[in-house]
């Protein structure tokens, strides 16, 4: 198969996985900053997140990560040397609106991403930017229960409008949410929900929150298209490949 000459070969990063600097230049904590690594109880924390904001773990990978916040110029240069033509990135919501409810955005955060996207462009790398990659502002989790509350839709719209307008000439390709369906599988990871998987109201809470995210995603697309009709905006779905253990019919039935 012959690919088009403008096919976007690239790599991917996410703010909570690479930036670090979790409380610098006005940024406040987000949901990912309370998750420990796999060796210190990450899976249990995600499935039973009721006390995650108060629990103290030995190590939080997102708080330092690979220090991309301070070293992005070096990292972009190295990525360019590898020959990539596109780089998936995400914006940390709390770098722009630290609590999610400020009337005015944080200029330090806006400037950082402007410089980051400009650096990508300088090396001929197309930024593909996600608005929300598993990082709900802590303040919105505590006050509203994160995406369980419809009021997050308007706050997300404000955030989306701010970054769409600021980077209208730097970014063409956008994603509203990373793995938007993950909120139904691991609610804390996907949407900052503190609901336990054993809660009898689990399905009601989770699917209501998923609905709110879907509405917010649609609203963001509408906003973005008004700001720049040339924007290409979508979202990302989580998926996995599974195979029967063997060709035994019982395994095949179990798989389906």
What are the roles of these predicted feature ranges?
Residues 91-105:
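Glycine-rich, proline-tolerant flexible connector loops at the mouths of alpha/beta enzymes
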Residues 61-69, 206-210:
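Short acidic-aromatic active-site loops that bind/stabilize oxyanions
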Residues 71-92:
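Catalytic domains of carbohydrate-active enzymes, especially glycoside hydrolases
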Residues 1-56, 99-101, 110-255:
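Active-site region of glycoside hydrolase catalytic domains
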Residues 66-78, 153-163:
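Short, acidic/polar
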Residues 67, 104-106, 149:
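Poly-acidic low-complexity segments
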